[in-house]
Regions:
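Bacterial N-terminal signal peptides
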Residues: 23-32
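Eukaryotic scaffold repeat domains enriched in small/polar residues
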Residues: 35-359
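N-terminal secretory signal peptides that target proteins for export/translocation
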Residues: 1-18
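General helical structural elements
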Residues: 21-22, 258
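Intrinsically disordered/low-complexity terminal segments and short unstructured peptides
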Residues: 1-2, 24, 193
Length: 359
């Protein structure tokens, strides 16, 4: 496993003392919404402007800003002739991201973004240079989409917190399954390639529910509490290449790690205002070297930890510019170690690259 340099000097940590100006009134909404070019970066995602990396020189760079996505035009996707004709007669469709939460991507560069404000999943298809959106099933539209994940066949699964369901879609955007058994408030979800099961975090049940791909509930783990292996309003989930499960345990202010069968391994984190403390943990992701990426919603940064909970690096800051966040939520790290961060109140997804050995 490649070792990241520990970030010894973290400038601008005065932001750790700031408070969010917008405080959501709904408790559940607060939990989920916060109420040098390197090899492997596609040409279409290469950054414009000065190179932005973390940590700053003279340290070797480990994270590089790549791009920002707010609309199809940001990725060079232009409207086709028939789309223009359709909009001429029927009006323009909403294609600009408004309030992203969950994000995922496949190895070919298709990006899927759950937009809870527009109640859609945006699909940016880079290989085909196309954009479309999924609004739900033929029988019922999304009410509050949050989590997105893909299985090994690249079928899409979307959690809808209001519908108390997870809906499966084929690659053409057609619904093929609706999972409801046991669900009360599904949020984050992830597919485990080691056992071909779908893991769903339920905020209200304080549990992780595990299903086969036919929608059968196989087992659950967690349950409300502060003891190890217990959860308190969990929100997000990630699964590494070995099948280990990582949970953002929001109101216990920690990350918990489990085996694929729900057996507890370890946890780390605490509430506080020191560097690396977890005041409002949100999205979580894992890179190919096993580093844990955790969105810190209160301070508008992404913290990177090793599996023992040692803080290795922090990137981002509060703001609206490149590499800055305003109430970031979800995060996803793909097989090429591209990092996608749902920058919720900036209405965009920012893309970064993990640089192995500083390049």
């Amino acid at each position: 496993m490649t070792t990241l340099h520990v970030y010894k000097s973290l400038p601008q940590w005065a932001l750790y003392r700031k408070m969010l100006q917008l405080i959501p009134t709904c408790f559940l909404l607060a939990l989920v919404l916060g109420c040098a070019g390197s090899q492997g970066i596609p040409k279409e995602l290469s950054a414009a402007g000065p190179i932005l990396v973390w940590p700053l020189p003279p340290e070797d760079p480990r994270i590089q800003y790549v791009s920002s996505v707010a609309s199809p035009e940001d990725l060079g996707i232009s409207k086709g002739f028939f789309r223009k004709v359709f909009e001429f007669f029927f009006g323009k469709t909403e294609e600009r991201i408004q309030q992203p939460y969950g994000v995922t991507a496949d190895s070919d560069g298709r990006i899927y973004i759950a937009d809870s404000a527009l109640r859609v999943v945006h699909v940016f298809d880079m290989p085909e240079q196309k954009y479309w959106s999924i609004r739900g099933t033929n029988r019922e539209e999304f009410q509050f989409p949050l989590g997105v994940t893909l299985d090994r066949e690249r079928r899409l699964y979307v959690s809808d917190a209001e519908r108390q369901a997870v809906i499966g879609f084929d690659r053409g955007g057609n619904a093929f399954a609706t999972i409801t058994e046991g669900l009360q408030r599904p949020a984050g979800l992830a597919f485990n390639a080691t056992n071909n099961l779908l893991y769903v975090v339920d905020v209200i049940r304080h549990e992780v529910l595990v299903y086969d791909l036919k929608g059968k509930l196989m087992f659950t783990f967690g349950g409300r509490g502060a003891e190890q292996a217990r959860l308190n309003f969990p929100t997000n989930i990630a699964i590494d290449r070995e099948g280990r499960v990582y949970i953002s345990d929001a109101m216990n202010f920690r990350v918990q790690i489990f085996q694929s069968d729900g057996t507890f391994i370890s946890n780390f984190g605490r509430l506080g205002d020191a560097v690396g403390d977890l005041a409002r943990p949100k999205g979580i992701g894992i890179d190919s070297d096993g580093h844990i990426y955790l969105v810190e919603g209160l301070y508008d940064v992404v913290n990177i930890f090793d599996r023992d909970g040692q803080l290795l690096l922090t990137f981002g800051s509060a703001g609206v510019g490149r590499g800055e966040f305003w109430l970031a939520t979800g995060i996803f790290v793909d097989a090429k170690d591209r990092i996608y961060v749902a920058d919720s109140y900036n209405s965009r997804v920012q893309i970064f690259q993990y640089l192995h050995n500083g390049r």
